[in-house]
Amino acid sequence: VLLIPEIDMPGHSAAFVQAMGHDMQSEEGMAILKQLLDEICELFAELPYLHIGTDEVQFTNPRFVPEMVAYIRAKGKRVISWNPGWIYQPGEIDMTQLWSYRGKAQPGIPAIDCRFHYINHFDTFADLIGLYTSRIYDQPQGSPDLAGAILAVWHDRLTLPETDLIRTNNLYPNLLALAERTWLGGGFQYFDQFGTCLPLDPMDPAHQAFVDFERRMLYRKAHDLPDYPFAYVRQTDVRWRITDAFPNEGDLARVFPPETALQPSYTYQGKTYGSREAIGAGIYLRHVWGTTVPGFYAEPQENHTAYAWTWIYSPQAQEVGAWIEFQNYSRSEKDLPPRQ
């Protein structure tokens, strides 16, 4: 395990301003920050990397980032920076971490792919399919310009007990999926092309690969991690039928034909609405990242109603638990309330 400490600078630093009384990019702030870097580099003397952030900020001092990179490098450490962030030329930074869809790897600068890897935004089941099947930065293998990938979980909210962060964000299954993909390379298409829907054809290579991964992962859950909060059960045997979306014109109480009979297709107001199969315990009708990541509907529209059904077999009469999850605007952020 390689620990990479990060001090985000000069952005995400309101606490620094409040505590020190100076903006990080000011002369006084830079002097204080260098003292903090002295302590950090001493504390983590055996670690080769230090991450300096540089994301989501307005730069007011053009000296700031180059001077901080040079200061840290002079202490024998290699420096990582977010991309998008400060713009570097080869040789000016040791590695970049691509944090958003706008982040692009640059020739001559090793990059870490993190663009679709924020598991606090993930559905427990659907995004695991996308994570496992996706190529790293849409490349089949690593290279001098592609160092690998990182999985992120932003735990901005105070969560007690802390183990709930691992459980609700499905850490271990996602960790195993990305670990195998980065170790072996390969994959099928990138997240923004493949999406999160498992192919229906059992002979499809992506279908077969995920079924095999799931089998091996559940073995590890049972034999290596039986006492860990491993929030996953088999989903490749779960089949749904989902209708085309009916226009409700904003009336969520409007009733459509599937409420009276379950059929392969329906005629409503002179138009035919079909239905299709889907596999998995979590199905995105529209992905949390919109049409950037494909979901069940190729062109999802507002003010529509969809119907989905499946069958559950039990060999005997019994009471069992139900695992029900809906989009929750990320388990990290406190903003983004639904429109009224």
Question: Each PLM stretch: what is its role?
Answer:
Residues 2-4, 47-51, 78-80, 93-97, ...:
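Structural preference for beta-strand elements that scaffold enzyme active sites
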Residues 100-237:
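Flexible, acidic glycine-rich loops studded with aromatic residues
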